[in-house]
Amino acid sequence: MADMERAPKVLIADPDRWSAELLVELVRKARCDAHLEVLPDSQSVLEHCRTGWPDLLIVDYGLPGIGGLELLREVRRQRRHPPVPFFLITERVDAASVRAALPLAPTAYLAKPFNAEDLLQRLRNLLLEPGEELACPVPSVPNMQSLEEYLGKARETSSGAPLLKVVHEALDHAMQSHKRDLAELQPLFLQDPQLTGQLIAAANSAGQHLGNSCQTLDQAVARLGSQHSLNLAQGLALQRSVDLTDPLLLPHGERIWQQCQRTAELARWLAQCLEGDGERCYTAGLLHLLGDLAVLRSIQSWRDLGGEELTAEQVEEALRTHGAPYGSALRTRWRLPLELRQLIAAAYQLGGGVYSKDALILHIAKLAAELPEGEDAAQLAKHKAARMLGLDATLLASLPKLGMSTQASASSTKSSRS
């Protein structure tokens, strides 16, 4: 067990919340008992250091205020012995920028996008003695809160949904084998609501926002870059309770994941048939039950912290009560683009006024995905959304089945309608 009296104090200063969260997870992975502080600007860092020096500073070059380089200069002016370890993360890798930093002796000068595995090893080398291993106890539920109390408080701080097991295993393998080929992983990412949602959120953050919003995974990866996208994904894989391991929760998770993927596939198929935005419809379909998945992850966290065993009825009641509020809170807190949030909302109900084609598509796709297996979707032809889209019973009856290539099916259907 780690000795909390010697647990290192690590200060992270990065204006981008997603990058800061990645750094937090890497520090926790390297040293599970570290005391962490995350600060948004250089003034906060200086004020914090005046009250007590950390054992390590990890600072972004573009930190608001005097900036990362000047902050390093100010830290070195204090002439502490030994010098405070200082990792400077920067996009400036030109010779002049490197020469400007060298006299200030940064412990590490890390170019963006940095290699997460390399940074993790640097952190271990700095924060652990050679051969040292730590085992940190899992905290318990404060005062043994009831599940309802825990879920009510966790809604505004929830990290989101669990990862699909196949995605988590692939990310673990990539980190352990030092393989960083996003092209191999991206098809898996497209199936995972949590990864898709967080990469889109990161791509639309203030630090990344350039012009139009990103509303699909491909757009997000193009803006973030493959290496930073993979870093953020690996950071997610390091988070606590990111797997559903409770046998009672797994069937619920599998059902909801399948519902998300089925809605996404049908929405894209219909959009391709009707000349809508297929990838945007796919994204909204994949994310429409993000809140339900986040509730399951919070229940898993509650169980990991020592919460009592539950019944299936209790889990179902928690999903009914908290699924929609969790989803709304997450989409707002992640600052997903308003247009994407409105499209996700259309899965549940069509508001007043003019309906966009994509909104109608998503609404009918969700209804079709909820039909029991083997039930004919032709019955949906009478629905308002189907009538407004001009969908007849014949087309609805030809909706692709689970596991069928929706793209190939849509192409052939579109040809027959031409």
Region spans (language model):
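Conserved alpha-helical "signature site"
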Residues: A2-D3, A116-S301, L305, L310, ...
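Acidic catalytic/metal-coordinating carboxylates
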Residues: P40-D41, G67-R73
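Active-site residues of response regulator receiver
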Residues: L57-G62, T90
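Alpha4 helix (beta4-alpha4-beta5 surface) of REC/receiver domains from two-component response regulators
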Residues: E70, V93-A108
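A short, hydrophobic beta-strand element within the central beta-sheet of small alpha/beta folds
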Residues: R73, P83-V93
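A Lys-centered signature of the CheY-like receiver
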Residues: A111-K112
